[in-house]
């Protein structure tokens, strides 16, 4: 099995970008260990604090954010970072070429029940000569990403990574601390009979999504004339990994549950990197009205609707939104 650096070198990745990705993964190896220790590590449960999103922070949210923040800023490879757990961007090396946005522990509410969690990250180039303290350097559409990925902490620790040359899976060899290539060029099947959505919010969805899901639930007695299965892990990283592995549709649509916050997922460090991974594997990633990676951001923690996965099924879903 091949190690990560030679694979990226063959793709023509700049050495500094490879070094940056390896820096991110160094933090993720430590996170994998802490998550794997569970109750033994003393970091399960919640803190008394909330993050900028108004969400109660888990102890592991704080720990994983600090690990990634420290190792990235100390590396010298980043001009600035943006994190789900930071109110504002954090300046790094003024001479660095790259900026990184990340969700340090997606699905952190799952830690207390020993279920799937993961780290999501997005890498872009900073505008030349930009001030590292200027948050506007992150206001770039997802098509500007030079790398995107996640590390899934499950029975094994898996890295899904793209640098624009396809989506690959690497598995952490915990004996040697090395990520090894275990699937070259993931390909999402165009058709599927699986979908992932938080069905408890159905009464709050827009009519288009309600109609689409109702037709899936109707199965072979409805207009789709075949049966579908629903899956829901309650961690985007887990649900998207299933889509990349065997196909499916994942969505967190716009809803009216909280009128001041109609969308759930963050554009910069959740929707954009997942969209790049999915598109590089032959899938589609949309808000329901536009391609996710075409969106011009207007805030660090901007939220968007997400519909992504198998090409033909996503296109069918989008047809309900026209």
UniProtKB/Swiss-Prot annotation:
UniProt remark on cofactor binding: Binds 2 magnesium ions per subunit.
Organism: Pseudoalteromonas translucida (strain TAC 125)
GO cellular component, one term: cytosol
Binding of Mg(2+) 1, residues: 84, 103, 105
Transmembrane segments annotated in the record for this chain: none
Family designation: Belongs to the FBPase class 1 family.
Signal peptide: none
Stated name of the protein: Fructose-1,6-bisphosphatase class 1 1
Biological processes annotated in GO: fructose 1,6-bisphosphate metabolic process; fructose 6-phosphate metabolic process; fructose metabolic process; gluconeogenesis; sucrose biosynthetic process
Pfam short name (any one): FBPase
Keywords: Carbohydrate metabolism, Cytoplasm, Hydrolase, Magnesium, Metal-binding
């Amino acid at each position: 099995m091949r190690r990560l650096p030679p694979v990226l070198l063959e793709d023509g990745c700049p050495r500094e970008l490879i070094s940056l990705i390896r820096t991110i993964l160094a933090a993720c190896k430590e996170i994998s260990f802490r998550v794997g220790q569970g109750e033994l590590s003393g970091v399960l449960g919640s803190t008394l604090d909330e993050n900028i999103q108004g969400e109660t922070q888990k102890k592991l949210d704080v720990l994983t954010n600090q690990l990634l923040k420290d190792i990235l800023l100390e590396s010298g490879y980043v001009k600035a970072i943006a994190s789900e757990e930071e109110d504002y961007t954090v300046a790094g090396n003024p001479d660095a070429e790259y900026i990184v946005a990340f969700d340090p522990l997606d699905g952190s509410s799952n830690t207390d029940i020993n279920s799937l969690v993961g780290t999501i990250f997005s890498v872009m180039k900073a505008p030349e000569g930009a001030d590292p303290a200027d948050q506007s350097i992150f206001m770039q559409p997802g098509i500007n990403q030079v790398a995107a990925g996640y590390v899934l902490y499950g029975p094994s620790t898996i890295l899904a990574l793209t640098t624009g040359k396809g989506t690959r899976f690497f598995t952490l060899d915990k004996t040697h601390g090395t990520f090894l290539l275990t699937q070259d060029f993931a390909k999402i099947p165009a058709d599927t009979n699986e979908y992932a959505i938080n069905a408890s919010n159905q009464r709050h969805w827009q009519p288009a999504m309600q109609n689409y899901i109702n037709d899936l639930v109707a199965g072979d007695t409805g207009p789709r004339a075949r049966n579908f299965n629903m899956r829901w892990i309650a961690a985007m990283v887990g649900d998207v990994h299933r889509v990349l592995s065997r196909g499916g549709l994942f969505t967190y649509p716009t809803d009216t549950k909280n009128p001041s916050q109609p969308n759930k997922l963050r554009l910069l460090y959740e929707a954009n990197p997942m969209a790049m991974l999915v598109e590089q594997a032959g899938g589609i990633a949309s808000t329901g009205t536009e391609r996710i990676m075409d969106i011009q951001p207007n805030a660090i923690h901007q939220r968007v609707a997400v519909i992504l996965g198998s090409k033909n099924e996503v296109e069918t879903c989008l047809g309900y939104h026209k």
